[in-house]
């Protein structure tokens, strides 16, 4: 019911796409180790929400971590061998450790097929023809089990191989892949390897967010969304003025460099201690600037 209330809010302010970011909070088959003790969304709940959103002209887009930010899944006995850092599942939980050190080991032959199986199971619940594979903040890549391969081929080559493989696989199914652009900022020239038809989600959350990242990827031919934030995460109260300035700046960059959309973000890094409804002002700023970018 809470998610339906959000859908009503988005509809009221002409927000026509919505992504629910998932790491482990869906009831995946054969992954009860990851969601046990939590309250994961079920297939029935997601399909009901998808229908509810479509009735309000909102496209509900699946968003699933498929490279970095896989703490709960890669900490299970079943999947810990797929984690970049050996024995990371034995380290006591902390929000910082969970967020920074659970990257998929792409040198493992099982890794890509495992991710494809999760995407296949999850994507079937949505009517959207888009899929956000995320692939952001792969902090550990090349530093553990894949170090030998990274030393041979280069860390960025490992990153690109995984992203390109998933993108081509989705495109072959007539699905538009989306991914976060933070790793590409460091190597914008490598964007030529990304297949045509992929959407890059270019984020930046500062009040006076610079245009460089949006400009550089635009010059490389990227099709992109600009992605500001509501500035509520990791705090008790929202930074409302920061969100206003951030949304204004990112919308300006998007208009200047011909972005095709805006995705406003509300994260739960270090625990979402801020009340969810405190995000509403930032959500509305994004809607206002997106529809009135000039």
Language model segments and positions:
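Generic hydrophobic, helix-prone segments enriched in Leu/Val/Ile
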Residues: 5, 21, 82, 284-287
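Aromatic- and acidic-residue-enriched carbohydrate-binding clefts of CAZyme catalytic domains
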Residues: 11-12, 19-59, 69-113, 124, ...
